[in-house]
C-alpha cells in the first residue's frame, strides 16, 4: 500500500513554471509590479492563483488555514469620525489574535486592485465595511468567493450583511424636535451625500420632525455637502444668503457643523445668540470648539467592537443573520444651541 502523498504549499518556482518565466520575474511581478509589463504581471498573477501560491509573510497559516488578518474598508481615513470605530475594531481583533489592515475608499480607484488581490489570494479572513459600498465589483466571477463580511455604521439592505449602527432617523428626529422645543421654526439642514443611506435616514428624520411640529418643509432650507469642513462652511453660507435665513441648523456630521460654525462667525453672527447649531457624531473636537457643540453622540468604540465580535462569530463558523443590530445614541446639549427669547 502506497503512503499518501503529503500536500505541500506552492512555491515561487511553481508559479514560474506555470507562467513560463524566471523566478526573478515572478518576484518582481508580485513584489514590485511596476518593474514588469502589465502583460507579464497579469500572467504571473493568473499562474499564482492557479497553483495556489501565497506570498510570504502575508501567506496563510497552512496548519490552521487562516491569515489572522482582517481588512477594514473606510470611506475616508481622514474623517475623524472613524477613529474610535477603528479603535474598537483593533482592540477587539488584537484580543483575539488578529491583525487589522485599513483600506481607504477615498482613493478607491487606485486601491481597488489591492483589495481584490487580498481577497482572491485569501490573505484576509474577514472584512468590515464602514461604508455602504463594496470597494470592487462583486459581480466579477473571480471575486464571488468573498470572505465573511460585517457592516458597521451604515445600513444597506441590498447587501444583506450583518450590520451594527444607530437609528439615524430617530436620532435626527430628536435633534430637530429639540430645536423646535427651544422655539425655533426656521430650521435648516446641512445634509450629507445623497447616495449614502445614513444621510437618507437623517434627512427623513429632519423632514418627519418638521411635519410633526406643523412646519412646512422648505427645500431651500436643505443644503448638501460631503462631510468636510469646507462643505459645511459653503452650505452654511448658502443658508445665510436666503431672504429669511434659519435661526437654527441641524447638520449631518460634526465636521460639517464645525465648518458651518466657523462660517457663521466669519459673517459676524454669534452662536448661539444669533444662530443655534447641532452636529452629529460627538467627535472629540466638539468639546473644545467655541462654543462647545450640541450633537448626537454615537457609541463609536462600541460599534466597532460589536461589529468585530460579529465578524469573529462568522469566521468561527457560527450562523450570523443579516440585518441590523441597533446601538443607543444620545443628544448631548452643549453651548451651540439656546432657546429663543
UniProtKB/Swiss-Prot annotation:
InterPro entries according to UniProt: HTH_LacI, LacI/GalR-like_sensor, Lambda_DNA-bd_dom_sf, Peripla_BP_I
Molecular functions per Gene Ontology: DNA binding; DNA-binding transcription factor activity; transcription cis-regulatory region binding
Organism, by scientific name, is Escherichia coli (strain K12)
Query: What gene, per UniProt, encodes this protein?
Result: cytR
In terms of PROSITE patterns, this protein maps to: HTH_LACI_1 (PS00356), HTH_LACI_2 (PS50932)
Which SUPFAM superfamilies does the entry link to? lambda repressor-like DNA-binding domains, Periplasmic binding protein-like I
Which GO biological process entries does UniProt record here? negative regulation of DNA-templated transcription; regulation of DNA-templated transcription
CDD domains in the cross-refs:
HTH_LacI (cd01392), PBP1_LacI-like (cd06284)
- Report what the protein is called: HTH-type transcriptional repressor CytR
Described function: This protein negatively controls the transcription initiation of genes such as deoCABD, udp, and cdd encoding catabolizing enzymes and nupC, nupG, and tsx encoding transporting and pore-forming proteins. Binds cytidine and adenosine as effectors.
Keyword DNA-binding attached: yes
Lineage, opening ranks: Bacteria, Pseudomonadati, Pseudomonadota, Gammaproteobacteria, Enterobacterales
Q: What keywords are assigned to this protein?
A: DNA-binding, Repressor, Transcription, Transcription regulation
* HTH lacI-type domain residues: 10-64
NCBIfam families recorded? PRK11041.1
Which residues fall under the DNA-binding region feature?
A: 12-31
The record's Gene Ontology cellular component field reads: cytosol
